[in-house]
């Protein structure tokens, strides 16, 4: 399932696989951080909104595979990601 997640860029998308309970997030969210928003079409407000409405509404055990660094889970990021509090 394609999740439109603008913020890092206007056309940002994540790809959720319900059967495997995983989401490929690109630069939307990282383990303990979020993607840059200083691009022409980036928006910090839109990014946080996308994370809260699209990523954090997935099941807590959903594995998140970001474009950089280590994988994480929805539950972990909801609890520990300082950028999303």
Regions found by a protein language model. Name each.
Residues 4, 9-85:
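Metallo-beta-lactamase
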